[in-house]
A protein has these predicted regions:
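A generic structural signal for short, non-catalytic loop/turn and secondary-structure boundary residues
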Residues: 35, 73-75, 93
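Short amphipathic alpha-helical segments
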Residues: 40-48, 143-150
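Short, well-structured alpha-helical interface segments that form or flank functional binding sites
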Residues: 43-50, 54, 75-79, 95
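A short acidic/basic microdomain associated with nuclease active sites
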Residues: 56-83
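Intrinsically disordered, low-complexity regions enriched in serine/threonine
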Residues: 1-6, 86-94, 100-274
């Protein structure tokens, strides 16, 4: 489940605790999942959100994973995206963000990452460790201060985003290079491309005029949006019953979203260096 405000403008609205509870109730868990280690010290993520608000961060989007095991429900991984109230958007195109990940089901500790939100497509991107490394914080009971410090550490590195976007924009890809990038991107969702409902080159199709172009930044954004939003299909492909394949579904799960976002950025970095 996901909740976000209408970010068609460059001013993201802060979401309330009521909205957070409605879409990511694991943020408000009052205890860890039974059976956690005795070294685990519980602290509700909601308290971290409150502390972030006091430091000038506003939560603008939240989501949680869909656990396979019912025992993990209510404790599963969740994500909150924050923007600074005093942060100025980069030329009205994107706003830098700090992303908080956590769970209370023994699967992970706190993770603080850099991200950005593009206004034109209303998509959130996540920055890979190769540019701005994530900061990990264990559940010790003293993590509020460590997480606040980590958020400002990430904030201090956010200017790298504008520089990297400029670098991506300066690189023009040939048709063959763009197609190879698309094939690698499709593999993030489908290990066997023959089982995908689309051809890799379909991921290169822009959804709006602003995303047209052959530069690395434009192509990265087209691939990211098409992989996550789905809705595309290869009308020439048939399923096992000889019928046309169904359109590619949108990504709803948090784990898959993380895999695609981080993986795609890493591929883009490799393309940039080559």
């Amino acid at each position: 489940m996901i909740i976000t405000n209408d970010r068609s403008s460059t001013h993201a609205l802060e979401i309330t605790d009521t909205e957070l509870m409605a879409t990511a109730p694991s943020i408000f868990a009052q205890a860890p999942m039974p059976g956690v280690s005795g070294r685990y010290t519980f602290l509700p993520t909601a308290r971290i959100v409150d502390a972030m608000r006091q430091e000038g961060w506003k939560p603008i989007e939240a989501r949680q994973s869909s656990p396979r095991l019912e025992a993990r429900r209510g404790y599963q991984m969740h994500q909150v995206r924050f923007q600074r109230r005093d942060q100025v958007a980069e030329v009205d195109e994107f706003a830098p963000e700090v992303i908080l990940l956590n769970s209370h089901d023994r699967s992970s500790g706190y993770e603080i990452r850099a991200g950005m939100f593009r206004f034109v497509c209303r998509n959130g991107l996540m920055v890979a460790d190769s540019l701005i490394p994530a900061i990990h914080v264990r559940h010790t009971g003293q993590e509020i201060g460590a997480i606040i410090q980590a958020s400002f550490t990430i904030l201090g590195q956010l200017p790298k985003l504008a520089d990297r976007v400029a670098s991506f924009r300066s690189i023009s890809l040939t048709n063959s290079a763009a197609r190879l990038f698309a094939e690698q991107a499709l593999a993030l969702r489908y290990q066997d491309p023959t089982l995908a409902p689309i051809r890799a080159e379909q991921l290169l199709e822009p959804r709006r005029h602003e995303d047209a172009g052959s530069d690395l930044w434009a192509i990265t954004n087209r691939l990211q949006e098409n992989l996550l939003r789905g809705g595309m299909r290869d009308t020439t492909r048939l399923n096992r019953n000889g019928r046309p394949v169904r359109p590619m579904r949108a990504i709803r799960g948090l784990d898959a979203n993380l895999k695609i976002n981080l993986g795609l950025w890493e591929i883009a970095e490799t393309v940039r260096l080559n």
